[in-house]
């Protein structure tokens, strides 16, 4: 897919997981919440090693600085709809650098991601936009079907301990104790 021109200042470029990894990591560091597993591990998991295929992502290039200032992605998945598996995507990793928001590349980035759905045989996409990106996702055709509640059953207390205990040594000690004392209770509940 060739570069798609948006406004004179920005162009939307299809991302390449090998060629654009450094740019993605930079945009993520500047704009996205910290990934619990770390940025490199998250990138590998979703952009390089996803068993359903690598993420399809797009970058916005600022022609004035010749730098990438935004990104949007879709992650292939499967949904079960009325008993049938449907090829779908999760929309995510949507970020635009400060100073390029507003009338910048946000809408063209999301349009590129939505257009990629059909090109890759995906039937639909869903996402979890924050309050700042909701108007943009609506503008490109997403519909709010309702709120999603996630229910999680923790089976290993180590995951929770490592998330909240800052000291690595203390986290390791607490995880060891919780493995013996809490994990059996978690499995029984």
Q: Which positions does each model-derived feature cover?
A:
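Conserved acetyl-CoA-binding loop-helix of GNAT-fold acetyltransferases
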Residues: 96, 101-115
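Acetyl-CoA-dependent GNAT
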Residues: 63-69, 73-82
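Conserved active-site tyrosine of GNAT-family acetyltransferases
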Residues: 136-137, 142
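Conserved GNAT acetyl-CoA-binding A-motif
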Residues: 117-130
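Conserved catalytic-core motifs of GNAT/GCN5-like acyltransferases
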Residues: 79, 143-166
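Conserved acetyl-CoA binding element of GNAT-fold acetyltransferases
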Residues: 85-98
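Short amphipathic alpha-helix that is part of the acyltransferase structural core
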Residues: 2-68, 89-90, 163-189
């Amino acid at each position: 897919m060739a570069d798609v021109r948006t406004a004179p200042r920005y162009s939307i470029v299809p991302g390449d997981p090998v060629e654009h990894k450094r740019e993605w990591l930079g945009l993520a560091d500047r704009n996205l919440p910290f990934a619990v597993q770390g940025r490199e591990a998250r990138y590998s998991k979703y952009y390089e090693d996803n068993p359903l295929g690598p993420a399809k992502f797009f970058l916005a290039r600022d022609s004035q600085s010749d730098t990438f200032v935004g990104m949007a992605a879709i992650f292939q998945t499967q949904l079960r709809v009325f008993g049938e598996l449907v090829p779908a995507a999760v929309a995510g990793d949507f970020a635009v650098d400060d100073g390029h928001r507003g009338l910048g590349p946000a809408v063209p980035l999301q349009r590129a991601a939505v257009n990629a759905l059909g090109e890759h045989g995906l039937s639909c996409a869903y996402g979890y936009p924050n309050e700042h990106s909701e108007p943009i996702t609506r503008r490109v055709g997403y519909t709010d079907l309702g709120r999603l509640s996630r229910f999680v059953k923790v089976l290993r207390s180590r995951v929770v301990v490592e998330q909240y205990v800052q000291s690595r040594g203390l986290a390791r000690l607490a995880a060891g104790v919780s493995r013996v004392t809490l994990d059996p209770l978690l499995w029984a509940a």
